[in-house]
Amino acid sequence: VAEEIAQHTLDETELGDYNGKFLKISTKTRAALMDIIDDKSVGIIEEDVERNIVKIAKPVGVIGALSPSTNPEATPVIKAINAVKGRNAIVVAPHPRAKLTNKMIIDNMRAALEKMGAPADLVQDVGIVSLEKTNELMKQCDLILATGGAAMVGAAYSSGTPALGVGAGNAVITVDETADIVDAAEKIRISKTLDLAASCSADNSVIA
C-alpha cells in the first residue's frame, strides 16, 4: 500500500520524490503512532496529590483537518492517529492538488478501522473538494487542525472555531560544542533533502 500511495501522490501533486514519500508513509506515520500508543488520552491523565490537582482529558468531538499539497501522504494519517487516540472523529479537507491522494488514504484508514471493529466513520473526507466545503467544515467542526499556507491557516484562525495551525516551516537546528559534527551534518542533510524538502518540517536553518 505504501508504494502505491507514494507513487500516486507524486503523480498527482508533482511535488517531492518517490523515496521520500515512501519513507514518510512507511516510517514517519508509524513513528507517530508508536510515540503515543501507550499514552493515556482520555480520563485522568495526570494527578498531583500534594496540590490536589487532577488533569482530565476528554474528546473534543469532530475535528476538521486541513491538509496541504506538500505532505498529503502523511499529514492526514498523523492527524487521524491523534484524533482517534483521543476518541474523536476527524474529517479531512485536502488541498485540491492532492484530493485523489487524500481519498486513497482515507479509504485505507476506514478499511483499517473496520478491520479492527471500529466505526469507519471516525475518519472521513469532505467528498467533493472545494473552498466552500472547507469553509463550512471549519464552521461546523469542534476543533480545526490546519496545516498549509499562511492564508489558509489565517482563515482557520478567523473562522470562529478553536484552531491549531502550522504554516510556513522554519525548522531551526542547534549544533553545540557537544555534538558529533559529522553525524549532525549527515542528519541535517537527510532532513533537508528528504522528499526534496517538500515538508514544512524539513531542516531549514542551522545555529552552530
Predicted regions and their residues:
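Conserved acidic residues
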Residues: G61, D142, N204
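N-terminal Rossmann-like NAD(P)+-binding subdomain of aldehyde/semialdehyde dehydrogenases
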Residues: V1-I53
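ALDH superfamily catalytic-core signature
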Residues: I78, K85-G86, V153-A208
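Buried, small/hydrophobic-residue-enriched core segments of structured protein domains
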Residues: A57, L143-M152, A163, A179
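General beta-strand structural signal in soluble alpha/beta enzymes
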Residues: V92, Q124-G127, L145-G148, A163-V166, ...
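Conserved small-residue-rich beta-alpha loop and adjacent elements
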Residues: D35-A111, M116, S159-T161, N170
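A structured beta-alpha segment of the ubiquitous adenosine-cofactor-binding alpha/beta core
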Residues: V42-K55, V123-C141
